[in-house]
């Protein structure tokens, strides 16, 4: 059976794990993850919860791999992106209002 070269990666805020290895052609994403040993190294990975992708595109655990694929195991989001944007916009509005008040106050003194 032909062999394919793949990579598996798991990223953290400050660093990332990357492993390159060779598997049989037709190997599934799940089988590659299991064979890589990453689940033993990082016990926080749960294949029922963590999203999986190949080159930033979501895939199913049952999908077959191609030569050169990079399996990416995504960590769960710690914060809701919509909520973060909402808070940032509110803070910017508050900062703008304070700036306007400071400018008015400075103009009155002159």
UniProtKB/Swiss-Prot annotation:
Q: Which Gene3D superfamilies would you find in this protein's record?
A: RnfH-like
Family matches, as Pfam families: Ub-RnfH (PF03658)
* Top-rank taxon, per record: Bacteria
Which residues fall in a compositionally biased region of kind Basic and acidic residues?
Answer: 94-110
Q: Where is this region: Disordered?
A: 86-110
Query: InterPro entries, per this entry?
Result: Mopterin_synth/thiamin_S_b, RnfH, RnfH_sf
As for family, the record states:
Belongs to the UPF0125 (RnfH) family.
Query: PANTHER family given for it?
Result: UPF0125 PROTEIN RATB
Show the NCBIfam families listed in the entry: PRK01777.1
Tell me what this protein is called: Protein RnfH
Source species: Mannheimia succiniciproducens (strain KCTC 0769BP / MBEL55E)
What taxonomic ancestry is recorded? Bacteria, Pseudomonadati, Pseudomonadota, Gammaproteobacteria, Pasteurellales
């Amino acid at each position: 059976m032909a062999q394919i070269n793949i990579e598996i990666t798991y990223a953290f805020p400050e660093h990332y794990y990357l492993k390159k290895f060779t598997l049989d052609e037709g190997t599934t994403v799940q089988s590659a993850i299991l064979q890589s040993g990453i689940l033993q190294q990082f016990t926080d990975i749960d294949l029922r919860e963590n999203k999986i992708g190949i080159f930033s595109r979501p895939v199913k655990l049952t999908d077959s791999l191609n030569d050169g694929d990079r399996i990416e195991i995504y960590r769960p989001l710690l914060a809701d992106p919509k909520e973060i944007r909402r808070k940032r916009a509110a803070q910017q509005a508050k900062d703008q209002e304070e700036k306007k008040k400071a400018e008015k106050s400075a103009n009155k003194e002159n």
